[in-house]
Amino acid sequence: MISITEWQKIGVGITGFGVFFILFGILLYFDSVLLAFGNLLFLTGLSLIIGLRRTFAFFFQRHKLKGTSFFLGGVAIVLLRWPLLGMLLEAYGFISLFKGFFPVVFGFLGSAFNIPFLSTLFQKLQGSSSSMV
């Protein structure tokens, strides 16, 4: 079993609050203050979960620089109070950065939710890779 430190537990909570504020900001017609606060909490929580060095190593890999620039550029534009454009840039950057994790997530969701229609939908979204590791 992998031991989780107290900092990682705090990071999970902060990341959860960040996602909540981002979703709540979208729900309230792209409220720029909530989106900016959610972005800052999300990035802070992510760096607490995996550490600063691994966060920088993840975001600044050579093949992920395009996604990183769109994601962090979107965060900056949201902070400058252009929420719709910033969230569009962030969404593209997020998909570009985390596209390698999507088959794993869809595979987990397909096995976690054993509902016939949803499991077949997640299996189609998962693609050819069925490995959970």
From Swiss-Prot:
Q: Its Gene Ontology biological processes?
A: endoplasmic reticulum to Golgi vesicle-mediated transport; protein transport; retrograde transport, endosome to Golgi
Segments traversing the membrane? 10-30, 32-52, 69-89, 93-113
User: What topology does it adopt in the membrane?
Assistant: Multi-pass membrane protein
Residue ranges that the UniProt entry lists as topological domain Cytoplasmic: 1-9, 53-68, 114-133
The protein's matches in InterPro entries, at most eight in alphabetical order, are given as: Got1 (IPR045176), Vesicle_transpt_Got1/SFT2 (IPR007305)
Annotated Gene Ontology cellular components are:
cytosol; endoplasmic reticulum; Golgi cis cisterna; Golgi membrane; nuclear envelope; trans-Golgi network
The residues exposed to the Lumenal compartment are 31, 90-92
Could you list this entry's UniProt keywords, alphabetically sorted. Golgi apparatus, Membrane, Protein transport, Transmembrane, Transmembrane helix, Transport
Per UniProt, subcellular location reads as:
Golgi apparatus membrane
UniProt cross-references to PANTHER family, sorted A to Z: CGI-141-RELATED/LIPASE CONTAINING PROTEIN, VESICLE TRANSPORT PROTEIN GOT1A
The UniProt similarity line reads: Belongs to the GOT1 family.
Q: What does this protein do?
A: May be involved in fusion of ER-derived transport vesicles with the Golgi complex.
Q: What's the protein name?
A: Vesicle transport protein GOT1A
* Gene that produces this protein: Golt1a
